[in-house]
Amino acid sequence: MRRLFISLLLFGLPLLAACLPLDSISVTEPSPPTETTLPTATIDWFPASATPTLKVLPTTTATPEMNPGIGKQIITDTFSNAKLWDTVNSELASATIKNKRLTLAVEPGVSIASLRREVTLDNFYAEITVRISLCRADDNYGIIVRSTGVSFYRFILSCNGLIHVERIKDSVRQVIYEPVPSGDVPPGAPGEVQIGIWAVGGEMRLFLNGRYQFSVVERTFPRGAFGVFTQSKGDTPVTVTFSDLKVYEVNYTAPTKTPTP
């Protein structure tokens, strides 16, 4: 069964239809009479949250110390097999794999997410390339990590040049790293960026184009699925494509601080 995460922003509040990696319910899709109609989901993957205070983030060059312990490559995904991702095609949103790319396209006010199937990650380093075709202002896209259904982390890149991180727990959203500007975020479309995430234990470090951005320490979800998403926040469509996913093992133990006598 294909699984899909779609949210509709109607009357100022998000109405979402989504699919989950475990025990999920797929959204109802317009289909020919020969296809089976799927039930409707009610999970809100894009719940509202308070507007955080903006702070400035300097972009720094990545060093070996910022992503230590990277070991063997465990996933090389060229997006040649559509069965490995949640895909769907409808009038409001689509997640399709073609020409070795996963394309997410949404109409105004709609969101969509797609998870990589059959993979649960705990300590890892992942890289994925994103190409932005249609995107403006507060529209956004990014990656989902450690997803267990209605709970996950979302690293968000906005088309106004900001990045931030949210934790969604049982459909309740909380900003755990406030929006900051970054010169590595494409200011709208067209654009391209490589997103990297180093996750060990309760710490997650974000990299853009190989450059370290910031670190988040959050121990609520120790493991889960990996995915991608996009969201239209305005009155225009959004289209982004994802390609070249690579995932590596990470074997790293943080050094123990010696107590001061």
Label every model-predicted segment.
Residues 18-72, 76, 248-261:
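Ser/Thr-rich, Proline-interspersed low-complexity disordered segments
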Residues 73-92:
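Short, tryptophan-glycine- and acidic/Ser/Thr-enriched carbohydrate-recognition patches
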Residues 79, 126-128, 191-206:
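Short tryptophan-centered beta-strand motifs in secreted/extracellular beta-sheet-rich domains
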Residues 79, 243-247:
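Extracellular beta-strand elements of beta-rich domains used
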Residues 93-112:
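Short carbohydrate-recognition loop motifs
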Residues 107-169:
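Secretory/extracellular carbohydrate-interaction modules
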Residues 171-196:
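Short, aromatic/His-centered strand-loop micro-motif at the edge of beta-sheets
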Residues 216-241:
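Flexible glycan-contacting loops in extracellular carbohydrate-active proteins
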